[in-house]
Amino acid sequence: MAVKQVEPIDVVLVGGGIMSATLGAIIHRLEPTWRIRVYERLGNAAQESSNPWNNAGTGHSALCELNYTPELADGRVDISKAVTVNEQFQVSRQFWAHLVETGALPEPSNFINPTPHISFVWGADNVEYMRKRYEALKDHPLFAGIEYSDDPAQIRKWAPALIPGRRKDQPIAATYSAAGSDVDFGSLTRQLLDGLEIDGVEFEASHQVSRISRSKISEGWVLDVRNEIGRSKSRIAAKFVFVGAGGGALHLLQKSGIPEIRGYGGFPVSGEFLRTDDPEVVQKHAAKVYGKASVGAPPMSVPHLDTRIVDGKASLMFGPYAGFSPKFLKQGSVLDLVMSIRPHNLRPMLAVAFSNFDLVRYLVGQLLASKSTKFDALRDFMPTAEPGNWHRITAGQRVQVIKPDKDKGGVLQFGTEVITSADGSIAGLLGASPGASTAVPIMLAMLQRCFPERWAQWEPTVREMVPTYGTDLGDDPALADRTLEHTAKVLGLHH
């Protein structure tokens, strides 16, 4: 099969989700003359993890997610991870605000809406933890305005659905931030890609990249591509490749042969949510409320009751309920897990299997749980919830990163991991939450690693897009306040 064109494409983005769309939007502004092409296996963009019903749509800024503020052995609450996540989200907010201001994105309410973020717990020990967490966060510039209460009357004002039907003697506590958001990453992805297409970026739907290999005739890569309509095959050359194919990224990076992927594996976790579109139920709750994971449960198990705004219509979602599927993509193959096993990642995968009994126990418990048991988890948040008003939906597949470790053999990593080749000509993204919310800083950091020789000339443009890039807002309260106020105004959020 011959290479289709003599001149290689400057940039090929594999996968039509939020990561590729974000990277394409950034590169196009840094190098407007570069030829960029996006390949998407399915018939349209944002059909897997970026689809609004395949994720909870939380603009992850650690305002309410308790897994980012663990309690240490000495009783103190560590907020360092929360600060990092919030700093990253502010970079994304600045980039989105820049695109809105320059007309590259239309009305922001099409993809982001103000939604209060609430942490909610019950039980005396959890109430004490919540109080300590609030004390640790309240004076930080990025968490200014956060409120705390253990008064049911006040909590009812913040989130009316949490209180009716609850035992009056149950200790409860909550924190509230009006600065939260709900993000439709599917809409954002499509709008970014639509804008890129208008500017000449090529988007090829229904095209699957089946193999990536080093070019033997020039620097860069050769990609084998199959048109899913008609099944025709082609081979194209690219100078730089980004594999943003979600759960499919591991397979393609393995096929590329880069040594940096050696030892890495993936652990797929499926998920379900309960959803209601009933207007009477939806109007009782307008917030994202995150609880506390059970003792020993993994971070992915944190339960939350979410307002979702998709296509201008409000709904509620509760979950996640975890399950197991060997697929790496929702529309993937049951052989995905088996086909990802290599001699170099077998030891890390076995090490993770033997050292994560809490995760195994959690997954088995979720798989064996009855419908009534699962619904009781929703009633912990909304005591008056009725099964007839809710239906189950299947979320996107999450592939947790199994990372090689010298001491333990392998560790299970929650979050995202960027893999880049030594020469910076190929990169890929593995992992899950809070990926979409932090897409902009992740992609900027990746570009800095892959194109170090260009970064100095790119930096002025980066500063136009993200004025505080490289600065910790937490170290400058005045700058943090100005930045949050500006992006909130542009994006229609609360400050």
Give the positions of each predicted feature.
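Dinucleotide-binding Rossmann-like beta1-alpha1 core, especially the glycine-rich loop
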Residues: G57-K157, A314-S315, S325-K327, S333-D336
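Helix-loop-beta segment of a Rossmann-like dinucleotide-binding subdomain
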Residues: E107-F120, K157-D199, V222, S232, ...
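Short beta-strand to alpha-helix junction loop
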Residues: S80-R93, V121-E128, T175-G195, E204-S206, ...
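Helical element adjacent to the flavin cofactor pocket in flavoenzyme catalytic cores
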Residues: Q170-F240, S437-F451
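Flavin (primarily FAD) binding-site architecture
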Residues: V243-P259
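C-terminal catalytic lobe of FAD-dependent flavoproteins
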Residues: Q170-A179, S187, F324-Q457
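Glycine-rich FAD pyrophosphate-binding loop
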Residues: H28-P52
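Short hydrophobic core segments
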Residues: V12-V14, Y39, R235-G248, M443
